[in-house]
Regions:
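Alpha/beta enzyme core
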Residues: 4-163, 167-200
Length: 200
């Protein structure tokens, strides 16, 4: 989320034992600058890329920055475009960089991403507080159902992040109980001093 994680938030998340993902709604140069601010503190950091043709350049520059995590971030992660950018990143990245892709909501999509060689899948079609997928596309899957289905299609060593639908702390517990290895939050930490969003 572009109003949640830039360097200031990523630094605090890393200090707390997590990893912040610098959003892709910045220019490539600004995103690199935010990544370097976190790295300068000696902390882990991730960065998001999209799937259109200009994102190949973004991905290449992010790989050169030696980020700890690259997230192929799209509303529907079971597509040819997602496959193409994953293949591109896999050829260029080092073994030290973890590759995550999503978002997905089915076992079939999990198998698709696992076959492409991702380390982590990101689960969630429409549950986020600012997500418009359900309104615009008319599709969405309840988060718990999505997690349980995706888990069935995962390869043994591939991890799963639950992305979206966290309104209460208990939602984190439910996601973990459904098999998620980690949980991605947005609105829960938006509007804090560390977030880049403007306070109105």
């Amino acid at each position: 989320m572009d109003t949640v994680t830039e360097s200031k938030m990523a630094i605090e998340i890393a200090k707390a034992g997590g990893i912040g993902v610098i959003h892709r709604n910045l220019s490539i140069n600004d995103q690199i600058l935010e990544i370097k601010k976190v790295q300068k503190k000696g902390l882990v950091v991730g960065a998001a890329v999209g799937t259109n043709d200009t994102e190949l350049s973004r991905a290449e520059k992010i790989i050169k920055c030696k980020v700890d995590l690259i997230v192929v971030d799209t509303a529907h992660g079971h597509t040819k475009r997602v496959a193409n950018i994953i293949k591109f990143i896999k050829k260029k990245k080092s073994n030290k960089t973890t590759l995550c892709a999503g978002n997905i909501a089915t076992a079939e999509a999990a198998k698709f991403l696992c076959k492409l060689g991702v380390d982590i899948v990101k689960v969630g079609i429409g549950p986020g507080s600012i997500c418009t997928t359900r309104l615009v596309a008319g599709i969405g899957v309840p988060q718990l159902s999505a997690l349980l289905d995706v888990k069935k299609g995962l390869s043994k060593n591939v991890k799963m992040i639950s992305d979206g639908g966290i309104k209460f702390s208990g939602d984190i517990v439910k996601a973990l109980a459904a098999g998620a290895d980690a949980v991605m939050v947005g609105s829960m930490i938006a509007g804090t001093n560390e977030s880049p969003g403007k306070i109105i």
